[in-house]
């Protein structure tokens, strides 16, 4: 068994073998894609090939894919110029002008969008999969209602893409954000999908100025290695999605069954409409932050919430949105599995977490 047991795949994923091979293959392709000589032309060809491959994975057109440095940048770019309606469980990179509430399971009742005052807003955004509790939202249904109100729709698909099917035409979204390191690509690269029809209605403005890259909409020299690695990583994730989800789901259910045998344990949210890799659980009287710290001493990597908020001793806004008290939210941990995990690792983690919960409770008495 590995010395390190990595159970925090919602924070980031290991670089997959397909992405590693692409990086090694193109390490010497250093030409600036904006240059007119042959080295630059070769780099442009690599970028456009990756754009086509990524577009195919989500049923988009190549010219609808714009490369960014991250999912957060893609989210910020998508929403920066618009008054936006969101939900109360969004990632912090999503600005909130008005929010639609979720139920105790973290799911948006899409019918609530019929009652929203759209008069002063131009865009609605809802994340496809929540980064803390793994809830899958009814994006297609929300988009239909939003469009019926003559509004535009964006979805943050950072936790969805590569893990559940994403078809932008089926979902009928106008914009969609993604981040490479959530599905096996290196950090520092993501993309924003912008539908061609949406661009006809709105004059898309750049968030980052300084050059004419990405059709003049994002300044800055492109991250060639990140881009050429992201394409095969996404292809690999899409190709093996069904079998990996089945395997990871079995591991998740076995681990969850063991953890729920601990007295005073509670699953946050529901297993229904949830990605197969996610567990968000709390233990009465046990600090989530303390449990995470102790697990680290045993080589187990878990989190007490979103990686973007680690180190902040405030209760999760997502857990509070589904009805938890501050104390219950602070007593929660997040475990997110990947296809690299083994049954042996899961059994070890269950055993260690059970013992640590007992230890923390004993120390508090």
Q: What spans do the regions from the language model cover?
A:
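Pyridoxal 5′-phosphate
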Residues: 1-365
């Amino acid at each position: 068994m590995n010395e390190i047991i990595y159970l925090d795949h919602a924070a980031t994923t290991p670089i997959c073998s397909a992405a590693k091979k692409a990086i090694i293959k193109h390490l010497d392709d250093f030409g600036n894609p904006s240059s007119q000589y042959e080295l630059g032309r070769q780099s442009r060809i690599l970028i456009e090939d990756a754009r086509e491959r990524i577009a195919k994975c989500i049923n988009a057109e190549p010219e609808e894919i714009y490369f960014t440095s991250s999912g957060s940048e893609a989210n910020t770019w998508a929403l920066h110029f618009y008054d936006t309606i969101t939900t109360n469980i969004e990632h912090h990179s999503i600005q909130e002008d008005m929010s639609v509430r979720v139920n105790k399971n973290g799911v948006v009742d899409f019918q609530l969008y019929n009652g929203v005052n759209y008069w002063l807003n131009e865009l609605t955004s809802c994340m496809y999969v929540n980064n803390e509790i793994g809830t899958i939202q009814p994006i297609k249904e929300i988009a239909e209602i939003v469009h019926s109100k003559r509004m535009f729709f964006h979805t943050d698909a950072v936790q969805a893409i590569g893990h559940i099917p994403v078809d932008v035409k089926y979902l009928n979204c106008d914009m969609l954000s993604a981040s490479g390191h959530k599905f096996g690509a290196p950090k520092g690269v993501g993309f924003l999908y912008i539908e061609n029809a949406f661009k006809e209605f709105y004059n898309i403005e750049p968030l980052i100025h300084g050059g004419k890259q990405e059709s003049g909409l994002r300044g800055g020299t492109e991250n060639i290695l990140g881009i050429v690695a992201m394409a095969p990583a996404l292809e690999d994730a899409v190709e093996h999605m069904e079998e990996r989800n089945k395997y990871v789901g079995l591991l998740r259910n076995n681990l969850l069954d063991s953890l729920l045998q601990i007295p005073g344990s509670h699953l946050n949210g529901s297993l229904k409409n949830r990605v197969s890799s996610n567990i968000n659980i709390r233990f009465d009287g046990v600090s989530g932050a303390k449990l995470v710290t102790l697990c680290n001493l045993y080589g187990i990597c878990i989190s007490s919430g979103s990686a973007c908020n680690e180190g902040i001793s405030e209760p999760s806004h997502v857990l509070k949105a589904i009805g938890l008290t501050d104390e219950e939210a602070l007593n929660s941990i997040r475990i997110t599995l990947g296809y690299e995990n083994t049954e042996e690792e899961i059994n070890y983690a269950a055993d260690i977490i059970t013992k640590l919960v007992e230890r923390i409770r004993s120390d508090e008495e």
